Amino acid sequence: MKNTDFENPLEDEAECTLELQDNEWKFEYCDHDRQIARAIVFDDSGFFYFVRAVRDDDFGKSTLIETSGGGVEQNEDLTKAVAREVQEELGIVVDIVCKIGVVSDYYNLIHRHNINNYFLCKVTSFGEKHLTKDEIECFHLSTLKMTFEEAVKEYEKCSNSKLGKLIANRELPILHRAKQIMDSIISC
């Protein structure tokens, strides 16, 4: 992660970049890249909102915590994608505070390179979720509302599975960076 001063956390230089490898599954080949927009979502009380997934699939049986997010659709920019994903998965309308950074990681099991674009987003209102059939029936998605400390502990707890480790490796540094940005905004 790039070191920066925090006098103006909204400048581009405050963005971080991480490049991670998948050490859980053997690399055979990578046949596609996926542009992903993800959100660290917080409210006026300082709570964070995440997605809980309970899965039993090719990645194994696991209970996970993950940021809201997903693939960027054709002719969609990153900011529209992140706002759409948060509304669909959490039922929350957000304002984008800033881009936190980009994490490049791999899912060797499905031969995919992920380009995760993370945004810090503030809740403006709550509404209905719009989950897909797979998100309901296969991944059993639900919403987690947690303090920063609770979220860190939950990522650590959920890293008991291979997929949980990959997600925690990708998201914990971003969550810590988001907290730094939030703290610097509050102290300004």
What is each of the regions a protein language model found here?
Residues 2-40, 44:
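Acidic, metal-coordinating catalytic segment for phosphate/diphosphate chemistry
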Residues 93-101:
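A short coil-to-beta-strand element that immediately follows conserved catalytic motifs
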Residues 47-88:
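Conserved Nudix-box catalytic region and its N-terminal flanking loop in Nudix hydrolases
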Residues 42-47, 56-57, 73, 120-128:
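Short, charged/polar surface micro-motifs in flexible loops or helix N-caps
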Residues 50-52, 131-134:
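Beta-strand scaffold of nucleotide-dependent catalytic cores
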Residues 128, 134-188:
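Nudix hydrolase/Nudix homology domain
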Residues 105-130, 144:
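Active-site-adjacent beta-strand/loop module that shapes the phosphate/pyrophosphate-binding cleft
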